[in-house]
Each structure stands twice: as C-alpha cells, then as structure tokens.
Amino acid sequence: MSDRVYLRAIDIDRYLPHRRPMRMVSEVLDYADQQVRCRCRIEADNPLLEDGSFPARGGLELLAQTSGLLLGLTQQDAEQRVAGIVQVKSFRLQAVHVPVAADCIVQARLLAGNLDAAQFEGEAYYNEQEFFAGTLMLAQLLKETT
C-alpha cells in the first residue's frame, strides 16, 4: 500500500498516546504487510534533546513510537490500548549529529506476536545515515477497571 492519499489519512493520534512535544512521528510514508516507514520530526521543545541535538539513543523512542503505530495499524479492528517497551533485545548506535528541526526516517517491521505483545526490529536514519538499529518488544497495558 503506497497510495499517498490513503497514507496521509492515517490518524496517528488514534494509534499513539503521545502528544507534542514527546510524539515525534509526524507522517506515515509507507505501510504494507507488517512494516511501516515514518517521518519523525525533532522539534526544539523535544524533552530528549541534549545540548541542542537529538542523541542517537533517542532512536529507541523513535523505534518504539513507530512500532506502536505499526501494532495499531495491523490490528485496526481491535480496541486500541496503550503499549510500552517491555524488553530491548538488541540495539546499535552510531554517532550522528541530529539537529533541532531535523526529519528522521524510521522503519519498523513486525517480527512476531499479537495484539497483547509483539516483537519489532527497525532502524532510524538522518540524512540517509543510520544512527539507531534495534529489536524491541512492546506489550499492551491492561485496561484499568473500576
């Protein structure tokens, strides 16, 4: 599915609980068969900034948000619940200067799992240079009962 009109219609707010300034996923560029590619914007008020730049380890949050979006997209008919990182299986960092107002491209692929818990792998790029790659597991949190 690479129809840009359809992709722009994806309501990211429906799938991610994050709001500005923490939500960095700004656009879905491509989505097909258990993988997604997103644009992520690094804003000046981003809480992860260090000395005016986005650290490579922040790629973990970019991958988590992109993976959470993918989890929601693959389960569109199910009730949406908040998910969190429960395990980081592996990661690789590269020293890359990612400035404020940068657009990063993040790819995520669903490796295994279901709506309750799933494993993803992916990469984050700035200017076509990979600065983060990793594998993580997300689990949806239990719905609070009263």
Positions of the model-derived regions?
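Compact, glycine-rich, soluble single-domain proteins
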Residues: 51-70, 85-86
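Short aromatic-glycine motifs in intrinsically disordered, low-complexity regions
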Residues: 9-19, 80
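Hydrophobic beta-strand-centered segment that forms part of the acyl-chain substrate-binding groove
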Residues: 5, 69-105
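HotDog/MaoC-like acyl-thioester-processing domains
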Residues: 3, 69, 99-100, 105, ...
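Small-residue-enriched segments and motifs
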Residues: 23-26, 86, 91, 106-108, ...
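Catalytic strand-loop segment that frames the active site of acyl-thioester-processing enzymes
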Residues: 20-55
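Short coil-to-beta-strand transition motifs
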Residues: 17-24, 98-104
